Amino acid sequence: MKDYLGISGKAAIVTGSGRGIGQGVAEALAEYGVRVMVCDINDENGEAVAAGIRAKGGTAEYCHCDIMQTEQINALIARTVEVFGTVDFLINNGGGGEAPRDFFDLDDARFDHYVRLNLYSAFAAIRAAFPYMRKQNSGRIVNISSGYALCGGEQCAHYASAKAGVIGLTTSIAREAAPFNINCNVIVVPTTDTPGLHEADGEFVDDELPLIPKGRIAKPLDIANAVLYLVRQLYTSDAADD
């Protein structure tokens, strides 16, 4: 296991880590010796990711969690503490969008659903994990937002609004957490090659590529490398960088 980031032996939760970005983050953390709690709503995917990490010599457990349900988030944090003794890193990756939808077709229930999935879930997980980080006077929280939070986009008002809220949540919590040596950061991810992207809109990638100077969309490993940078155990004052 690599250890030059100083994170070997730390305990991490990665929500939505059964595939895509979350899987990439979980596997990258494990490669550096972090003990990872894989969490997903799809048990087959989540168990497979955890098993894959263990097969490569890493430490990982799986916990089913619907991040829209407060009691399940609380149970996830409690299970992690039971298994690993604490929570050092919380990666709020779980969330998602849907196929493009005109804003005037959005009813209250659909808008609320995506706010709860993308924004409330991060808030609830931080609230549950924070006491453990505060007690040990250290912690790293990384929230995953989206480029749509900054520049918007047609037919995604509900998703963009929720992800913009994640940025506001992060900057506010970063100020409150800093006195306890807890960093809270947000990564504003670009279009990333994940199964969810292709399921939501199979033609989107082809339309997007000509607009990207490098000619490729991001890979989960690109996001994972950003997470590794933010959780490294070196002095940093970038408690609210994005």
Identify the function of each model-found stretch.
Residues 4-37:
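Canonical Rossmann dinucleotide-binding motif of NAD(H)/NADP(H)-dependent dehydrogenases/reductases
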Residues 101-103, 107-112, 197, 208:
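Substrate-binding pocket helix/loop in short-chain dehydrogenase/reductase
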Residues 126, 162, 170:
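Active-site helix of classical SDR
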Residues 131, 175-179:
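Alpha-helical segment proximal to the catalytic Tyr-Lys
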Residues 146:
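Residue(s) in the substrate-gating loop at a strand-loop-helix junction
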Residues 212-223:
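A conserved structural motif in NAD(P)-dependent oxidoreductases
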Residues 235-242:
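Conserved small/polar residues in nucleotide/adenosyl-binding loops
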